[in-house]
Amino acid sequence: MMNLSKLLKLACLGAGLLAATVNGYSWGQKGHDVTCAIAQKHLTKKAKKQISEILDGKSIVYWANWMDNASHTPEFRHTSTWHYKNIDADETFENAALNEHGDVIRAIEEQIAALKSGKLDKEGKALALKFLVHLTGDMHCPMHMGHRSDRGGNQWQIQYFGSGKNLHSIWDSSLIESAHKWTYTEWVEQIDTYGKAENKAIAEGSVSDWGRQTYEISKEIYDETPVGSKLSYDYVSRWTPTIEQQLLRGGLRLAAILNDIFK
């Protein structure tokens, strides 16, 4: 469990950070906006009201990308390992070596526990919420469950439409932009189309269950994307349904988490 006094001490970060663009940690700005917009759409009235009060009238979409910026500052550098969980090819999800500084699964579980504890004041709740809404998106980005040996695909070099890239970077943002030229609201309109029963089924399970599911996808990606691969339209077409699926899963599961916390 994280130190609650530290949560309170580090509750705020200058608004100027929100203008920065950092793609090194996660889905990229649009992916996190989509995840949080889907979650916002599925919040109960009670959860939406409480969250709005905690965030001073802002929705969770407003804070979707805040943590990527914050993790690059001295105050929040300790959260840099929270964005991912590295699992090497010879490990299983269950027996992967733990990072002493934390990982995305543990960090999500800690934010949930902190928000349910009743021990946080408004600023502490706001900080935990900002972490939680971002990390839930990270957990559904496949290369955030990548191999430790190549730093989650950061050292897995490929060609993407003729340009040198690494596997992590194309899964963070390049594929989303190549898949559809949509705004984040258009993404929500197009992929959040299931009925209540399907949405409920997607939201079932634990944080670890969801992380394991993402890890299984990352294994497929590694298998189908050897180092040096030359990727273009076929690759985008192959993986677009997975991107849509993971963004939807992240949004619906985030809504389920928040509705349970603020019931």
Task: Go through each PLM region and give its residues.
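N-terminal signal peptide c-region/cleavage motif recognized by signal peptidases
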Residues: A20-N23
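Hydrophobic helical h-region of N-terminal Sec-dependent signal peptides
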Residues: C12-L17
